[in-house]
Design a protein with these regions (language model features):
Chain A
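Hydrophobic/aromatic-lined pockets within catalytic cores
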Residues: 95-99, 122, 158, 177-178, ...
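GST superfamily/GST-like fold recognition
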Residues: 165-189, 200
Length: 248, 248
């Protein structure tokens, strides 16, 4: 997408110098496999806002990154000396400064409703991370947890999208975790999750297919095999942040 | 305060009937000792918005409550058939429908900054709940955790309030947990936390004194001995939600 510059640029390490940011430009500090940062990528894509992406090593954090975000997490955006982080705060900030492309509805109740949906769907991320690390002792509880989260997601889907007829705020915020849930059977083949999504969640399955057709999702999504390779490297304590980057 | 009706009304149980809500009125479903519900109380008080309060038993949850909020948590507000929950969502909704008394600033960056402060100060609530339940095994780690959270809070306080010269959104959202941290030495005398706040955190100590002078805090705050009695009852699995209510 023409509005992204550097979405797949090489990840910067502590020894790398931070390129200067031109006045008026917006920069996104990103990690290519972080679902929270992906929320910001989806938002920039959906709003078609021009952005320069800096990919950051989150295990060995550059000093210049911690100076900008003391929590050391992604996403962070920088804009005329202003620093904004936390994925939901970044999304609202982008809507506030570019109101013409606001993803959040203007109506107070509909706005609140989108945020409540995100809260109710957040059980998916908890369940995903639980299963990612599940041991023989707790994998049964983890699978039950995921089923419960997906049951909720299935029941809350009453239209094409969580945003209604078109995709909205809740869709942008929940998608990155659903993308990873879909890949979980490949990341953890030992858990035998293959059929989990397909048969029990017809609405959610159709929703995932629908989401994959959205231009913003096409920008942000990573191939399943890259997710698998990333998590394999992550487990070793040395995540490979540059998986899938092809030499220029 | 004249705008509150029923802030200290008797807590309703599953067998109690829910009184009808008049059209145009706003109702807050509350639990008198819940810090998240207290955020909403502070917000209604600060904005001087008229509200009817229903106190709800959160151990034995009334069916009518779960129908309104499937998560069964407080605060929830009800307003002309609309249901809004999650404390931060409730606060923004109240600002959206009563913009003249908006607590959140209009400027996008200042808005974002208030929300980032809440995120950074949220370590206080985690540390508080950790110490509330601390055992001999983990109390040292719990105390270190609280100190770290308070160090951050001390360093982030660069003016009279987190909102700046006057109290703001971040103050309303962080206060309920600070109120409880101050009472922690009485709830858990075995942890010897008495001098924790007084000596190491001069800015925070002055801030707490300043907060207690605000009209909205005077409405929402509970006496230390009521917090202690509540937590003593909570530990038994039978929380006494009606501590401090005097017969009409």
């Amino acid at each position: 997408m023409a509005n992204f510059h550097g979405l797949n640029s090489i990840t910067l390490n502590p020894d790398d110098e931070l390129p200067p940011l031109a006045s008026g430009k917006i920069r996104l500090y990103n990690m290519r496999f972080c679902p929270y940062a992906e929320r910001a990528v989806l938002y920039f894509a959906k709003k078609n806002v021009s952005v320069e992406v800096i990919n950051v090593n989150l295990v060995d954090k550059p000093k210049w990154y911690l100076e900008r975000n003391p929590l050391g997490k992604v996403p962070t955006i920088e804009h005329d000396g202003k620093i904004i982080y936390e994925s939901a705060v970044v999304a609202e900030y982008l809507d506030d400064i570019f109101p013409d492309s606001s993803v959040l509805p203007k109506d107070p109740y509909l706005r609140a409703h989108q945020k409540i949906l995100v809260e109710r769907l957040s059980a998916i991320s908890g369940a995903f991370y639980g299963l990612l690390r599940a041991t023989a002792d707790n994998q049964e509880a983890g699978i039950a947890n995921l089923k419960k989260a997906l049951d909720t997601a299935e029941s809350l889907l009453t239209d094409n999208f969580y945003g209604g007829k078109s995709s909205g705020y809740a869709d942008m915020l929940v998608w990155p975790h659903l993308e990873r849930v879909e890949v979980l059977p490949l990341i953890r083949p030992d858990l035998h999750l293959d059929k989990l999504l397909g048969t029990d969640y017809p609405k959610l399955t159709a929703y995932i297919a629908r989401m994959k057709e959205l231009p913003e999702v096409k920008v942000a999504i990573r191939p399943a095999e890259h997710h698998v390779q990333f998590f394999d490297s992550y487990k070793t304590g040395k995540p490979d942040y540059n998986i899938g980057i092809t030499a220029a």
